[in-house]
């Protein structure tokens, strides 16, 4: 009996704390998420990081990506979507955010980066960023990563297309994301 008790106590001592077991992140995004792929795991070494990034992924595809994880969907989700969508369709973007948040549920933290890119068909992405900020103000578990402010402070990061950035820019984005993700704990 003592031997069993000793083994049980030893096993408990070796088990990670509950909070460490819950440190998991899904990155759900487009080409900007592709750019941060090598940096995020380095910034969150004690986290289990899963990444689903695809060039040209649209915001309306975000919820389906998350559904594929089912019960394995991490407690924290980073969304990098909207850059490939029509900024004139504010209702569509709001619906995409609502769909992602519905899949996330109230117990998960979602960190969504706002959008930097030139206007599309003469329409700015400021409207999308306002919609995202508005949705975040109404949802305790939705946080905005202020990518717009970061790029405004470091325009030298921007590539010629006005949407993608240099390696230093992706590194800085991953660093900022890691800070936001840690606040979800």
Predicted feature locations:
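Bacterial N-terminal signal peptides that target proteins for export
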Residues: 1-5
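Catalytic His-Asp segment of secreted/periplasmic serine-dependent ester chemistry enzymes
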Residues: 118-185
């Amino acid at each position: 009996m003592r031997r069993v008790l000793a083994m049980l106590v030893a096993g408990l001592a070796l088990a990670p704390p509950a909070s460490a077991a819950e440190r998991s992140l899904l990155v759900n995004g487009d080409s900007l998420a592709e750019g941060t792929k090598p940096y995020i795991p380095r910034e969150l070494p004690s986290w289990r990081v899963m990444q689903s990034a695809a060039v040209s992924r649209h915001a309306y595809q975000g919820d389906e990506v998350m559904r594929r994880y089912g019960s394995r969907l991490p407690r924290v989700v980073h969304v990098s979507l909207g850059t490939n969508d029509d900024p004139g369709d504010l209702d569509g973007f709001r619906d995409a955010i609502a769909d992602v948040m519905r899949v996330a549920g109230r117990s998960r933290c979602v960190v969504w980066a706002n959008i930097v890119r030139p206007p599309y068909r003469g329409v700015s992405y400021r409207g999308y960023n306002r919609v995202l900020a508005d949705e975040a103000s109404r949802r305790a578990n939705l946080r905005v990563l202020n990518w717009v402010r970061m790029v405004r402070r470091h325009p030298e990061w921007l590539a010629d297309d006005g949407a993608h950035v240099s390696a230093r820019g992706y590194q800085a984005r991953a660093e900022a994301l890691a800070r936001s993700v840690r606040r979800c704990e």
